[in-house]
């Protein structure tokens, strides 16, 4: 009868109201989820942090703060494990790259940083030395920024500086060396280096990743006109307790390194400042 029809109409109306409310609620939830995802994307950030040469006391305060805030830390091969004491809360992922050893593909590292950054997590890419000195920091920063990820670089003390300092070698010295040239021996094409400019530049030459190419470095510099008696310091494990140093001259550095059993990681410091440092040491010993 009429009462049943009226009840049915009322029921249908109630169902429509409930459905509308549910759709509104679902729509709001979708919008909230979308806004949350957008906020994460807008807040996507990666810190490229230099872990320094090895001695954990050479970390900067800013590096310690970034590690303390990190949710994810992607760790290079040459980072001292003691540095990781500053990020006990973080997920740690080893992405080591070392010449002659199995390495993590660079593209994989890029995508890992991007994935975690887009999740809104605090990502630290922890590199030995300084990110911008033979650490691919520039490449990684460019790759991330072109994908909308903010990048902040935290400098670290580079091994060339720390090793020289530990061996009492000033990289610049008035009247002896007017500058410093940092070079990597680990290149795809050795001919890309201007050996004559390196030999005649009048600066202290600091060579990274050169242990496997000592004989070639010696030959190239001699052929380019550098004096055979140019002082050389070969410094292994810069700034660490197991640091070792071998002093030599350019013409005989390959033979001396072999006798010394020089191993990577090591840096070469080539220049008159090496001899100047020895003079200072002798004077200090004589006056002691």
Residue ranges and their predicted role:
Residues 130-201, 244-247:
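Class I SAM-dependent methyltransferase SAM-binding "motif I" and its flanking Rossmann-like core
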Residues 9, 15-17, 26:
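Hydrophobic alpha-helical signal/anchor motif
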Residues 43-48, 118-123, 179, 187-288:
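A contiguous loop/helix-start segment that scaffolds small-molecule binding in enzyme catalytic cores
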Residues 81-82, 99-102, 158-162, 179-181, ...:
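Short gly/pro/ser/thr-enriched loop/turn and capping motifs at secondary-structure boundaries
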Residues 22, 33-36:
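Intrinsic-disorder-associated, low-complexity terminal segments enriched in Asp/Asn/His/Tyr and depleted
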Residues 38-56, 61-154, 162, 252-254, ...:
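Class I S-adenosyl-L-methionine
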Residues 91-97, 148-152, 171-178, 225-234:
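Short hydrophobic/aromatic-enriched beta-strand-loop microsegments
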């Amino acid at each position: 009868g009429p009462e049943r029809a009226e009840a049915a109409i009322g029921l249908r109306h109630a169902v429509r109201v409930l459905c509308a409310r549910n759709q509104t609620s679902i729509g709001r939830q979708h919008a909230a989820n979308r806004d949350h995802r957008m906020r994460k994307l807008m807040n996507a950030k990666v810190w490229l942090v230099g872990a320094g040469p090895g001695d954990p006391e050479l970390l900067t305060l800013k590096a310690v703060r970034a590690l303390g805030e990190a949710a994810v830390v992607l760790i290079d091969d040459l980072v001292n494990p003691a540095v990781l004491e500053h990020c006990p809360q973080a997920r740690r992922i080893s992405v080591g790259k070392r010449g002659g050893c199995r390495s993590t593909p660079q593209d994989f590292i890029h995508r890992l940083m991007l994935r975690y950054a887009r999740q809104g997590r605090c990502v630290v890419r922890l590199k030995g030395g300084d990110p911008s000195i033979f650490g691919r920091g520039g490449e990684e920063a460019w790759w991330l920024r072109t994908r909308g990820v903010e990048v902040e670089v935290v400098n670290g003390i580079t091994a060339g500086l720390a090793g020289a300092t530990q061996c009492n070698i000033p990289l610049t010295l008035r009247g002896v060396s007017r500058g410093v040239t940092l070079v990597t021996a680990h290149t795809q094409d050795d001919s890309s280096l201007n050996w004559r400019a390196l030999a005649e530049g009048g600066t202290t030459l600091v060579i990274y990743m050169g242990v496997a190419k000592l004989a070639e470095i010696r030959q190239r510099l001699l052929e380019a006109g550098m004096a055979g008696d140019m002082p050389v310091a070969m410094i292994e494990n810069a700034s660490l307790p197991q640091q070792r140093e071998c002093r030599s001259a350019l013409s005989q550095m390959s033979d001396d390194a072999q006798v010394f059993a020089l191993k990577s990681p090591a840096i070469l410091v080539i220049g008159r400042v090496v001899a100047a440092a020895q003079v200072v040491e002798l004077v200090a010993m004589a006056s002691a």
